[in-house]
Amino acid sequence: EVDSLWYDKHAKEVLRKSEEEYGWVYKTNHANNSTEGQIVLDTVKKEGIINYTVWSDVFICPTCGEEIIFTEVQKSSENLRDAFICSRCSRKLKKGECERAKEYVYDELLRQTTEIAKQVPVLINYSYNGKKYEKKPDAEDIRKIEEIAGMSLPYKVPFIKLPEGYNTNQPRKSHGIKYLHQFYTKRNLYVISVVYNNLAKYDTPERQTLTFTFEQILMGMSKIARYVP
């Protein structure tokens, strides 16, 4: 049995301490929707808090080699169901006909460069002044993502190789994911390490409950979380 007052107090404490360390990674410039996502120019910088970022898979057109951002062609090809048009050569394609674009990234935990399926940020949902907004990632968002990608994790995170099996072979084959930490973007992995570190400071039986609560959101932070407009 958990003392509810203790839980409430220390859960908020973990969040507060964690946000002091990682809060900046989820900040984004507020955009004026009336100007089609252009950044609001003001003497006072307006920043919102990111709720989530939508990442899109990238495919290669087998005819012309153009990189195709899947969510963008889905929007422009709504009447074609599972088919879409290459913006460069105009060929009508299906997802299964295209190879995934790949990229090489340095994996800090593996201490080596690894090949993974390329994904790019296409939408940011954020809160500003009590309201939710959506925008395309701007130059500052991209710069911040790249900055975090080059940073070292401040604390340890679980390092677990995926076991062989039907469900684990799917992400291994489609996205090159072979380890648990590869399910997360560097930004989310950074935050996970901070929160786990703050949870580890509690040497009490209640720590298990706090940790369990945090772990319930890990699936939603992963690359396999589906975006439903």
Please describe what each predicted stretch is.
Residues E1-P229:
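Nucleic-acid modification enzymes, centered on SAM-dependent nucleic-acid methyltransferases
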